[in-house]
């Protein structure tokens, strides 16, 4: 397999006053430096992990949930799938000195940004996947901002674990086109997949309701966020470009 797709678009973030890295879809980044990791999400999901003891943080950006990853494919292709993207992020955090049992997660994205998307909601699938995956890995979700209809801009401070999220206008250049392509890909995969056999006389218990998630403070609020929580921030319009 080829080299892992580590984000390389480094810049200086004037709003947060520190160096930053912009993550594109299928990329990830881990660091112990005082940096801001930035990405823009539609139906995609970004998982942000932090080890508060080691001061190490990381972010990924995946496009589809757990199915379809080919072990022989290039890493940049496999990173589009959540199962592989989460495995890579966790392993790279451990290599950097983090401990799995100390990891805390903040998760973002999973929006339904295409009007009329009802039968194939990639955002819902991605959101459900990342919650289930982290529960199985026993990594606690300390904050989340998932689903809805708006794209998001997410900033994550790797060294401290602080995060900020901004809801964007519905039509963001590049995001809408990417979402339409993802919907077509998911539709092709769904129609090509063989129909499962019907299991007769198999009564299933109703699923338990999902646990309540921590509330987060959105942009525009002036009150200070609690330590370690998702902090509201007023990102300038210049940064939305």
Swiss-Prot record:
Enzyme class: hydrolase
Assigned EC number: 3.5.1.44
Native organism taxonomy: Bacteria, Pseudomonadati, Pseudomonadota, Betaproteobacteria, Burkholderiales
UniProt-recorded Gene Ontology molecular function terms: protein-glutamine glutaminase activity
Annotated source species: Burkholderia lata (strain ATCC 17760 / DSM 23089 / LMG 22485 / NCIMB 9086 / R18194 / 383)
InterPro entries assigned to the protein according to its UniProt record, in alphabetical order: CheD-like_sf, Chemorcpt_Glu_NH3ase_CheD, Cytotoxic_necrot_fac-like_cat
Pfam family, one: CheD
Function: Probably deamidates glutamine residues to glutamate on methyl-accepting chemotaxis receptors (MCPs), playing an important role in chemotaxis.
BP terms from Gene Ontology: chemotaxis
Name recorded for this polypeptide: Probable chemoreceptor glutamine deamidase CheD
Protein keywords: Chemotaxis, Hydrolase
Keyword Hydrolase: yes
Taxonomic superkingdom: Bacteria
Catalytic activity: L-glutaminyl-[protein] + H2O = L-glutamyl-[protein] + NH4(+)
């Amino acid at each position: 397999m080829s080299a892992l797709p580590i984000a390389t678009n480094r810049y200086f973030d004037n709003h947060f006053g520190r160096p930053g890295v912009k993550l594109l879809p299928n990329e990830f980044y881990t660091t112990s430096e005082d940096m801001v990791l930035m990405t823009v999400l539609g139906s995609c999901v970004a998982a942000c992990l932090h080890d508060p003891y080691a001061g190490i943080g990381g972010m990924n950006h995946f496009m589809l949930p757990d199915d379809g990853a080919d072990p022989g494919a290039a890493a940049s292709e496999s990173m589009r799938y959540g199962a592989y993207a989460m495995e890579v992020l966790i392993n790279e955090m451990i290599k950097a000195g983090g401990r799995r049992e100390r990891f805390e997660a903040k998760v973002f994205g999973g929006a339904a940004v295409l009007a009329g998307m009802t039968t194939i909601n990639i955002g819902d699938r991605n959101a459900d996947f990342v919650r289930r995956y982290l529960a199985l890995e026993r990594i606690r979700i300390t904050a989340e901002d998932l689903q809805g209809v708006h794209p998001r801009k997410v900033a994550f401070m790797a060294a401290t674990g602080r995060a900020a999220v901004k809801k964007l206008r519905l039509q963001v250049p590049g995001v809408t086109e990417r979402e339409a392509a993802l919907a077509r890909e998911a539709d092709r995969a769904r129609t090509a997949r063989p129909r499962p056999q019907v299991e007769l006389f198999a009564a299933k218990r109703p699923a338990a309701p999902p646990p309540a998630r921590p509330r987060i403070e959105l942009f525009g609020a002036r009150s200070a966020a609690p330590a370690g929580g998702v902090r509201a921030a007023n990102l300038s319009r210049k940064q939305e470009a």
